[in-house]
Amino acid sequence: MFIVGLTGGIGSGKSAASQWFEKQGIQVVDADIVAREVVDVGQPALKEIATAFGDWVLQADGSLNRRALREHIFQSPESRHTLEAITHPIIRKSIIEQLNAATSPYVILVSPLLFETNQHELTDRNLLIDASEEIQIARASQRDGQSIQQIQKIIAAQMPRAEKQQRADDIVLNDGHLKHLYQQLIALHENYLNH
């Protein structure tokens, strides 16, 4: 199976790109969705997180208090490493299972941390959806309702844009309209079909 890693910073257009590929009949494995699934109520990772951090990470219904945990890990690199040590191996295993089950001509692995988590090791080619920091902040603040400061912290925690550009095999600049994004994706889709 030919696997294309798709990455980009917050607000870059990863979701728009992955949805376009899905409309072309290409299966998409989304690392963010997998990451949410592995910490659902009843999943072993959730129990490990509560043991490592304390019950404050749980809401009254037993689900993960994502916002509180996110704020905590952005303030504490040590806590972030603890969380990643618990979740990353479980996430990787689930991603591999989903990639292996794909039946489309190729499969897309969407991951905002494709390089940071070494998920690029699972791919044959890597596509960066790129946007300027100003565009990223504008899109993410409109979409998520987060403060500019919180979005800047997220951007700062991710691999620098220039490094992602160096590591990517293909780069799509998404500073404009969706029509322009889709035009660039059409050419890449044809290349990926002919891998």
UniProtKB/Swiss-Prot annotation:
* UniProt KW keywords: ATP-binding, Coenzyme A biosynthesis, Cytoplasm, Kinase, Nucleotide-binding, Transferase
Its biological purpose is as follows: Catalyzes the phosphorylation of the 3'-hydroxyl group of dephosphocoenzyme A to form coenzyme A.
Catalyses: 3'-dephospho-CoA + ATP = ADP + CoA + H(+)
The highest taxon in the source lineage is Bacteria
| UniProt xrefs under InterPro entries | Depp_CoAkinase, P-loop_NTPase
Q: Name the family.
A: Belongs to the CoaE family.
Where would you find this protein in the cell? Cytoplasm
Q: Name one GO cellular component term.
A: cytoplasm
Q: Where does ATP bind?
A: 11-16
Q: Pfam families from the entry?
A: CoaE
Protein name, per record: Dephospho-CoA kinase
Q: Does the UniProt entry include the keyword Repeat?
A: no
Pathway assignment: Cofactor biosynthesis; coenzyme A biosynthesis; CoA from (R)-pantothenate: step 5/5
One GO term in the molecular function aspect is: ATP binding
Indicate whether Cell cycle appears among the record's keywords: no
The EC number(s) attached to this protein equal 2.7.1.24
Q: Where is the DPCK domain?
A: 3-195
Gene Ontology BP terms = coenzyme A biosynthetic process
